[in-house]
């Protein structure tokens, strides 16, 4: 019988994490459970930095970006002795289960705890939208708004100067954020990690646009594909059009979460408590077709594939 739970945020922060923590805390308290907030992710779990939370601990948090519990990358958590100490800390406080909010790296920590017999529920918190088992992750739509606003501003200055602008978007090895922002921002060209990149093909496409009378263009590209400053120089040399590169960087992770992320985070937080009370452990929560779902966390990490939004790309191509 679950009586006490812990909640932590891990890995890169995303807007809506505070709303998810709030959802976990308020839903747990409504069921008579005690909740402990764990500071700075798995590092704080290992160092036994925890604090009991009440409903006032999460007051005025739903609208805040980031995570008030803090987050830290802690690769040492892969070590068996480190995890053993973390589990000992949980057991010493009488904590029966753990809710982990983060991306696939955070899920890996929850997976290892699950394999060692400690019940965990994972909530997908990342702007990258790269977690299997869910259509969308907490923070994706807020980051999308941030990127689209930046693209809109760049278009203003690009059109004024008849310039080509390259915008680098976060996402690691997932192009969802870039693709969605490119559609919403009306970008002329899209470069994604899921599609093999050939810079000469891109140059040819840009030249074709210029030949048709295009005065300016926006190229949206996911991070880690190439050096965008070098790409900008090459495009400028080949097209004779001024070309500038912009890296949006960590601004994409910040800001007050949009309404959808607040709702999604709240639903997922409450659903995590529902699963724990039903006796589930070792699960990860997702949303599919607007319904809450859960999957085996080990299966999600090892076997499930995140589908590429090919239909979105086809739509984008029609609108170039």
From Swiss-Prot:
Query: What does the UniProt keyword field contain?
Result: Allosteric enzyme, ATP-binding, Cytoplasm, Glycolysis, Kinase, Magnesium, Metal-binding, Nucleotide-binding, Transferase
Cofactor dependency = Mg(2+)
Q: Which organism is it from?
A: Serratia proteamaculans (strain 568)
> Which residues make up the binding site for ATP?
12, 73-74, 103-106
**Pfam families, sorted:** PFK
Q: Which SUPFAM superfamilies match?
A: Phosphofructokinase
Which reaction(s) are listed as its catalytic activity? Answer: beta-D-fructose 6-phosphate + ATP = beta-D-fructose 1,6-bisphosphate + ADP + H(+)
Judging by the UniProt lineage, the source's domain of life is: Bacteria
- Residues noted as binding Mg(2+) in the record, renumbered to the chain: 104
Output this protein's name: ATP-dependent 6-phosphofructokinase
For the protein in the UniProt heading, the enzyme class is: transferase
Principal location: cytoplasm
Q: What does this protein do?
A: Catalyzes the phosphorylation of D-fructose 6-phosphate to fructose 1,6-bisphosphate by ATP, the first committing step of glycolysis.
Report the GO terms under cellular component: 6-phosphofructokinase complex
């Amino acid at each position: 019988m679950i009586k006490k739970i812990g909640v932590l945020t891990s890995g890169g922060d995303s807007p809506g994490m505070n709303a998810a923590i709030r959802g976990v805390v308020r839903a747990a308290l409504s069921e008579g459970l005690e909740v402990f907030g764990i500071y700075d992710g798995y590092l704080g779990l290992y160092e036994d930095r925890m604090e009991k939370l009440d409903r006032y601990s999460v007051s005025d948090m739903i609208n805040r970006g980031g995570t008030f519990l803090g987050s830290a990358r802690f690769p040492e958590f892969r070590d068996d002795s480190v995890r053993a100490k973390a589990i000992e800390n949980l057991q010493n406080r009488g904590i029966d289960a753990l809710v982990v909010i983060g991306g696939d790296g955070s899920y890996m920590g929850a997976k290892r705890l699950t394999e060692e017999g400690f019940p965990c529920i994972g909530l997908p918190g990342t702007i990258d939208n790269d977690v299997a088992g869910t259509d969308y992750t907490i923070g994706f739509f807020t980051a999308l708004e941030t990127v689209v606003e930046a693209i809109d501003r760049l278009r203003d200055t690009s059109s004024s100067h008849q310039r080509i602008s390259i915008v680098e978007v976060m996402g690691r090895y997932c192009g969802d954020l870039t693709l969605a922002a490119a559609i919403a921002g009306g970008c002329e060209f899209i470069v994604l990690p899921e599609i093999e990149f050939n810079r000469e093909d891109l140059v040819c496409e840009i030249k074709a646009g210029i030949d048709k009378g295009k005065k300016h263009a926006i190229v949206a590209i996911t991070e880690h594909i190439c050096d965008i400053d070098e790409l900008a120089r090459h495009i400028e040399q080949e097209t004779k059009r001024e070309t500038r590169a912009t890296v949006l960087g960590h601004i994409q992770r910040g800001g007050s979460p949009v309404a959808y992320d607040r709702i999604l985070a709240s639903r997922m937080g409450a659903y995590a408590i529902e699963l724990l009370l039903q006796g589930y452990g070792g699960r990860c929560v997702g949303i599919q077709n607007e319904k809450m779902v859960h999957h085996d966390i080990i299966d999600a990490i090892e076997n499930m594939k995140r589908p590429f939004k090919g239909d979105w790309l086809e739509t984008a191509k029609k609108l170039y």
